[in-house]
Amino acid sequence: KEIFENPRTLKVAEISNDPPMNILQANIDSNKIKFEGIDVDVPNHLNNVKDKNFNLGIRASNIELSDNGFEFEVELAEISGSETLLHLKRGNSKIITSIEEVMNFNINDKVKINFDIDKVYAFNENGILASSPFGGSYV
C-alpha cells in the first residue's frame, strides 16, 4: 500500500501502476501548474513543492473524458477486456487513460479529458517524490 500511495521514485511510480503512471514535465507559476498550454490551480498538497520545474504524475484511472476538458489527440485505442486504454498526446506530452467501457476511437481523433488535480503527484527533476496526495515526500 505504501509503495502505491507514496512511490519513492518515478521508476517505482511507473512500474507499480498498470498502465504506468503518466509523467508530464510541468512547472508551477503564479499558483498554477502549467504544462502543454494547460493551466490548473495548484492543489493544497503541492503547495510546498520547492522546485518550480517538476514531473507531474497522474494515474490513468484519474483521467476521464469530459466535454469541458483539455483537448488531446488519440494515438492508439486498445480494447482490453471490458475497458479501453486510450493513448493520447498533446504537444510533446503523451498520456494513457483507462475508460471502463469498450469504446471505438480512430487515430488522430480529438478528445477532451479532465483529471482529478487532488490526486496528482510531484516528482523533482531527479525523479524523487516531492509530494503525493497521501502526504508522502522523500525530499
Please place each PLM-identified region on the residue numbering.
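Short acidic-hydrophobic catalytic motif
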Residues: K1-E5, A13
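ATP/adenylate-binding site constellation spanning eukaryotic-like Ser/Thr protein kinases
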Residues: N6-T9, N17-D18
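Non-catalytic connector elements of ABC transporters
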Residues: P19-I23, I28-V139
